[in-house]
Amino acid sequence: MAEFATIARPYAKALFGLAQEKNQIESWLGGLEKLAAVVQEGKVASLIDRPETNASEKADILIDLVGLKDKELKNFVIVLAGQKRLSILPEVYAQYQDLTLSFNHIKSAVIYSAYPLTDKQVGELAQMLNKRFDSELKISVEIEPELIGGIKVEVGDQVLDLSVQGKLSALYTTMTN
């Protein structure tokens, strides 16, 4: 959701800045990942949305469920709960992860394929994409049968569409204009 992204951005940046100061970037990433996963579970999500449960109770429950030990991360959860923003934790995690990758000079890439790719194919694609985008890439692969064939690659806001669906869409657009 674009709205969540806008709301989460300053929280992610502030937390990342503090993590840099404390030299805790990677460990806090793990804590945020757990928080984001727990918040998306059905019972926890309904608890967060329940107005009769006060903010400190919600924060305490989340902290206990995840088993957070770090004082600053606990305080972060308490601040989010106090501002009724616990539901943005998955987006905060996603943006914090992007900041971490950027800090380490790594970009995130998603390869969409109509069919499962072998490890060898993913490796070859990774080499080609690393050269093309002149950066080290953290690659994930997702299967999308509607592509019909070929692949589509997303790196940040750049899209490389080499799928049959993309070619057919381009052909249709050309023929109808």
UniProtKB/Swiss-Prot annotation:
InterPro entries to which the protein is assigned, alphabetical: ATP_synth_OSCP/delta_N_sf, ATPase_OSCP/d_CS, ATPase_OSCP/dsu
Domain of life (superkingdom): Bacteria
Pfam families reported for this sequence: OSCP
Chief location category: membrane
Cellular component GO terms held in the UniProt record: plasma membrane; proton-transporting ATP synthase complex
SUPFAM superfamilies: N-terminal domain of the delta subunit of the F1F0-ATP synthase
GO molecular function list: proton-transporting ATP synthase activity, rotational mechanism
Record's bilayer topology term: Peripheral membrane protein
Subcellular location, record wording: Cell inner membrane
Keywords linked to the UniProt accession: ATP synthesis, Cell inner membrane, Cell membrane, CF(1), Hydrogen ion transport, Ion transport, Membrane, Transport
Annotated function: F(1)F(0) ATP synthase produces ATP from ADP in the presence of a proton or sodium gradient. F-type ATPases consist of two structural domains, F(1) containing the extramembraneous catalytic core and F(0) containing the membrane proton channel, linked together by a central stalk and a peripheral stalk. During catalysis, ATP synthesis in the catalytic domain of F(1) is coupled via a rotary mechanism of the central stalk subunits to proton translocation. This protein is part of the stalk that links CF(0) to CF(1). It either transmits conformational changes from CF(0) to CF(1) or is implicated in proton conduction.
Record note on quaternary structure: F-type ATPases have 2 components, F(1) - the catalytic core - and F(0) - the membrane proton channel. F(1) has five subunits: alpha(3), beta(3), gamma(1), delta(1), epsilon(1). F(0) has three main subunits: a(1), b(2) and c(10-14). The alpha and beta chains form an alternating ring which encloses part of the gamma chain. F(1) is attached to F(0) by a central stalk formed by the gamma and epsilon chains, while a peripheral stalk is formed by the delta and b chains.
Similarity comment text for this entry: Belongs to the ATPase delta chain family.
NCBIfam families referenced in this protein's UniProt entry, alphabetically: ATP_synt_delta, PRK05758.2-2
Official protein name in the record: ATP synthase subunit delta
Gene source species: Neisseria gonorrhoeae (strain ATCC 700825 / FA 1090)
Upper lineage: Bacteria, Pseudomonadati, Pseudomonadota, Betaproteobacteria, Neisseriales
Gene: atpH
